[in-house]
């Protein structure tokens, strides 16, 4: 055997080794599908992280954390329901690829309008603050609704920012992934989609910290502005628009190179994969499906558990970092470390799902969130009794420790969500037929997520409406009790759904 044949044999053995399939299970001929989808996830999630940091920082520092529950209940939930109706109507008259581009373009258009028109001229578009204060004096129990009215453009930006991950990523992106990914490819593809997509957490965290500083490369474009918040917003929106345009270009590439290559049959200038069932017919299928019901339980549980902690955590962060620039810089640091842990979790998660199965990949998220959440609530509730611990650790106040623990909770919960929860949730859709994958998925992912947030928001809404001067600290015990119940139901849902999923795969 000559040297060339020997090298070829070694290369062949390396490519087909067990180690190679564990570390990199993607085959060469699959890269034309895998790479564009991974890049598309990267830029969609880049926008998601930038918008999330903006909306949280601006709303919490310029309004308050207590208003979040009112926005989630009375803003996000109705908008989510309206979207499902609109989405189903659009799916009946055009292809899902066209729907992706229309909806993504609408989001980018709104972000542009908000960043360059609504926020810079908010004094013109918003009602007089003195008028709002007068109404609050007369109607104290409607205080937070009046505050929302007084800052309506900022609230609308928050709602659109919340809908981006649910609609563009969870629904539209994963719908495309489910459409072009085969059942045997899913265990290998999905965790690595997440791995490559979530590397943007490191990038976006760095970008956020960079633009939160006084000097950055876009500053000359806005040198004439005096408002630091306006400069910050316009800089971020510029990056978001560029990233959004890249998303549209990548989606067009995937549509032409993958979707059309697999399905190019046309009849009367219409794609044969356009859905024709009505929303009512779709709802009947969803309501009679226990399988979809348990998927919805998982989505609701995650959304609700996040909602129960998030407001309290942000209220603590605001106490420590009251300035918008400092708040968003802290958010960037949390995102960066979330990215680090996500990369580690993605490598481990891919092997975990392939070796031990769907159940163990899905059960880690609720268990980790439960443990970290209970620790955070406990430290918050007993904040006034942490003096000795604070002095021992050398910190200036218990608030520093609580914010640190809250940051750890966020890092752990988001990293396992990105690396395991999203992938395992999408895997259970694959055995379903096309109708359930599209309209059924829309109802579960959009309405399910919003109902989960709304249930958590109802508790806070009622508390803050009855006691207008209350803050998150005052209801921490109630939030902790509800959080524990939700996590227990979540774990039960994973167990039952695992049994259903195994039966469907076997059939």
UniProtKB/Swiss-Prot annotation:
It is a multi-pass membrane protein. The chain crosses the membrane at residues 31-51, 67-87, 99-119, 130-150, 154-174, 192-212, 231-251, 292-312, 333-353, 357-377, 393-413, 451-471, 474-494. The keyword Nucleus does not apply. InterPro entries: ADP_ATP_car_bac_type. One of its GO terms (molecular function) is ATP:ADP antiporter activity. GO terms for cellular component: plasma membrane. It is found in: Cell membrane. Keywords: ATP-binding, Cell membrane, Membrane, Nucleotide-binding, Transmembrane, Transmembrane helix, Transport. It holds the Pfam family TLC. The keyword ATP-binding applies. Belongs to the ADP/ATP translocase tlc family. Provides the rickettsial cell with host ATP in exchange for rickettsial ADP. This is an obligate exchange system. This energy acquiring activity is an important component of rickettsial parasitism. This is ADP,ATP carrier protein 2. It comes from Rickettsia typhi (strain ATCC VR-144 / Wilmington). The gene is tlcB.
């Amino acid at each position: 055997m000559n040297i060339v044949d020997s090298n070829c044999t070694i290369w062949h053995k390396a490519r087909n080794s067990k180690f190679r399939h564990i570390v990199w299970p993607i085959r060469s001929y699959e890269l034309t599908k895998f790479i564009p989808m991974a890049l598309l996830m990267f830029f969609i999630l880049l926008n998601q992280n930038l918008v999330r940091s903006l909306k949280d920082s601006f709303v919490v520092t310029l309004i308050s954390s207590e208003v979040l529950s009112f926005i989630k209940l009375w803003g996000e939930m109705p908008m989510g329901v309206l979207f499902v109706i609109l989405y189903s109507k659009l799916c009946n008259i055009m292809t899902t690829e066209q729907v992706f581009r229309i909806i993504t373009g609408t989001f980018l258009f709104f972000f542009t309008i908000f960043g360059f028109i609504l926020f810079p001229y908010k004094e013109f578009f918003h009602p007089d603050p003195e008028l709002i204060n007068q109404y609050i004096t007369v109607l104290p129990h409607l205080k937070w609704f009046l505050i929302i009215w007084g800052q309506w453009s900022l609230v609308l930006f928050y709602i659109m920012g919340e809908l981006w991950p649910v609609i563009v990523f969870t629904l539209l992106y994963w719908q495309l992934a489910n459409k072009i990914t085969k059942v045997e490819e899913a265990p290998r593809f999905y965790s690595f989609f997440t791995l490559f997509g979530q590397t943007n957490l490191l990038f976006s965290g760095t970008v956020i910290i960079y633009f939160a500083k006084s000097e950055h490369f876009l500053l000359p474009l806005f040198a004439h502005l005096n408002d630091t918040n306006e400069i910050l917003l316009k800089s971020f929106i510029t990056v978001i628009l560029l990233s959004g345009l890249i998303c549209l270009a990548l989606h067009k590439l995937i549509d032409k190179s993958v979707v059309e290559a697999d399905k190019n049959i046309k009849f009367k200038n219409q794609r044969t994969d356009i859905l024709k069932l009505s929303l009512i017919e779709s709802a009947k299928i969803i309501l009679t499906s226990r399988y979809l019901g348990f998927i919805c339980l998982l989505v609701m549980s995650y959304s609700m558990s996040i909602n129960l902690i998030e407001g309290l955590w942000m209220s603590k962060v605001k106490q420590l970092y009251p300035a918008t620039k400092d708040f968003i810089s802290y958010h960037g640091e949390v995102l960066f470390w979330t990215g680090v842990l996500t990369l580690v979790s993605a490598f481990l998660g891919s092997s975990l799902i392939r070796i031990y199965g769907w159940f163990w990949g899905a059960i880690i998220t609720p268990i980790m969130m439960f443990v970290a959440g209970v620790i955070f609530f406990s430290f918050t509730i007993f904040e006034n009794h942490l003096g000795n611990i604070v002095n021992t650790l050398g910190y200036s106040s218990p608030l520093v420790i609580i914010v640190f623990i809250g940051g750890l909770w966020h890092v752990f919960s988001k990293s396992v969500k990105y690396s395991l929860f999203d992938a395992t949730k999408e895997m259970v859709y694959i055995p379903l037929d096309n109708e359930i994958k599209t309209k059924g998925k829309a109802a579960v992912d959009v309405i399910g997520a919003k109902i989960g947030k709304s249930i958590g928001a109802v508790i806070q809404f009622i508390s803050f409406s009855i006691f207008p001067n209350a803050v998150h600290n005052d209801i921490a015990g109630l939030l902790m009790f509800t959080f524990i119940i939700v996590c227990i139901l979540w774990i039960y849902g994973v167990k039952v759904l695992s049994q259903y999923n195994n039966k469907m795969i076997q059939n």
